[in-house]
Amino acid sequence: NYSSDAGRYAAGTTLDDMEQRYIQWGNNIEVGHGAISGGVDWKQEKLTSSSTTLSDAYKRDTTGLYLTGQQQIDSVTLEASGREDHDEQFGWHGTWQTAAGWEFIDGYRATLSYGTGFLAPSLGQQYGATRFASSYGPGIASNPNLKPEESKQWEAGIDGLTGPLDWRISAYHYEIQNLIDYKNNQYINVKSATIKGLEWTGNVTTGPVEHHLTLQYVDPRDDDTGKVLYRRAKQQVKYELTGQIYDLDWNVMYQYLGKRYDDDYDNGRDVKMGGLSLWDVGLSYPVTSHLTVRGKIANLFDKDYETVYGYQSAGREYTLSGSYTF
């Protein structure tokens, strides 16, 4: 008989039920040629991890205070922001970011930013049910001893409008302590990691069609071993076409992920996973001024692929949705 606890899985399987509540209050004040914003937000996470016989529940509250400011001085734009977050488990942590932009030629701008970050592990990563378990492997187990990520990052870029092409190129450098990842079938902390990358984005319109292209080169490495981090492709491409035929909106998206490395836990070795290409298509139609219907086909050509070694991803998927505004 069907059991809502086990779903379509075996009776011994454990499943997670995650609930989140979020409240935010903010205010914005115009100052000179810019603005100052501030506020408070609160988030509560609840996790129930249960089988047909046992159930464990966990809860965590996080309260944050934030302040941001932006000011335009001639051709220079300055921004700064800061946050203080109190995590019920990990206590108080402060983060900040600053950025500057300079329009050195009409239509062309240089930007530079630096900031810090903090990311607590999710309740699912700490206490949740084992994920992706199957007859082929034990899955990925939670780890209650996970530490939060702490990071420093800088980014420099140039953007401009050259003829019909709106483009941006940027370089970034992230230094992360206690990066949350998984290996040997369990969530872990990578003590120290560095992620460096170069990204180019471009947007251009040709007749009724808009083109959006993103090219990325990423070098993600474990600082202790010098190895490339698992499941992270160095080369990534995303190309999207969007357009409209009368009232019908349409889009076609292509995504390419280059080769990645992963951990073959059963045989104690690293494996190289080849690159993959995926296509998605979507349509959107306003039936009335209030009702819009959307359809999407993901993995259009029903490609067999894996983003994680040993775990087959979904084949072709069909989605139909609608939204109604009052």
Positions of PLM-derived features:
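Outer-membrane beta-barrel pore domains and translocons
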Residues: 1-5, 30, 41-45, 83-87, ...
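Face-selective signature of the C-terminal outer-membrane beta-barrel domain
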Residues: 1-103, 168, 205, 210-212
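Outer-membrane beta-barrel translocator domains and adjoining extracellular loop/strand segments
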Residues: 1-15, 48-56, 90-96, 123-129, ...
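Outer-membrane beta-barrel signature, preferentially recognizing the C-terminal barrel domain
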Residues: 16-19, 103, 107-109, 113-177, ...
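Transmembrane beta-barrel architecture of outer-membrane proteins
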Residues: 18-26, 43, 60-66, 93-95, ...
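Gram-negative outer-membrane beta-barrel transporters
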Residues: 33, 71-78, 166-167, 171-176, ...
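Outer-membrane beta-barrel "beta-signal"
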Residues: 157-159, 313-326
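Predominantly the C-terminal beta-signal and adjacent terminal strand-loop region
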Residues: 299-318
